Amino acid sequence: MSEIKLIVGLANPGAEYAQTRHNAGAWYVQELARICGVTLVPDSKYFGLTARAVLQGKDVRLLIPTTYMNLSGKAVGALANFFRITPEEILVAHDELDMPPGVAKFKLGGGHGGHNGLKDIIAKLANDKNFYRLRIGIGHPGDKNQVSGYVLGKAPAKEQELIEAAIDEAVRSTEILYKENMVKAMTRLHSFKAE
């Protein structure tokens, strides 16, 4: 397995979106930055907030695109190209409708599942889908016509607690990823479910 050199948290920019379910990926990167003691700062060259962090002695770039979600690939592509980071060395954290709040899972490759952020990243990586994802469960509204309003809405307090618990566990599992390997990180994270 390639070493992860870039961790991306997907989000929409602006205060009005900061607490919406669609920004769960960014919450994870913000928490990673906090435990690494680094500050995410705006960098127009990479169309996002970036930081250089050290996890278990290894250098990693953190990125939260400040483009809108459907243009996330612009930021990921710019940073990956500049630092010559391959898709296999990228981990993208995003909200996942098909998993309940309180659950998060790592995954390598796959489609975009209708997620506009993933869709644009795949396009900007020359259709290479072979990057890692951290899927953060937010649940599903039950009707596909309600998805847009749902992901752009705030989770009720109990659901928010579950999402945050899964993110905390994902951060701990990310430390295991750097200390040991992805298999051990997956084993830990995939057995977790916040209640």
UniProtKB/Swiss-Prot annotation:
Superkingdom of origin organism: Bacteria
Signal peptide, first to last residue: none
Primary localization: cytoplasm
Site location (Stabilizes the basic form of H active site to accept a proton): D95
InterPro entries with a match to the protein in the record: Pept_tRNA_hydro, Pept_tRNA_hydro_CS, Pept_tRNA_hydro_sf
Keywords: Cytoplasm, Hydrolase, RNA-binding, tRNA-binding
One GO CC annotation: cytoplasm
GO molecular function (one): tRNA binding
Alphabetical GO biological process terms: protein quality control for misfolded or incompletely synthesized proteins; rescue of stalled ribosome
The protein's role, per its UniProt record: Hydrolyzes ribosome-free peptidyl-tRNAs (with 1 or more amino acids incorporated), which drop off the ribosome during protein synthesis, or as a result of ribosome stalling. Catalyzes the release of premature peptidyl moieties from peptidyl-tRNA molecules trapped in stalled 50S ribosomal subunits, and thus maintains levels of free tRNAs and 50S ribosomes.
NCBIfam families linked: pth
Record-stated family: Belongs to the PTH family.
Protein name: Peptidyl-tRNA hydrolase
Organism: Shewanella putrefaciens (strain CN-32 / ATCC BAA-453)
Taxon lineage: Bacteria, Pseudomonadati, Pseudomonadota, Gammaproteobacteria, Alteromonadales
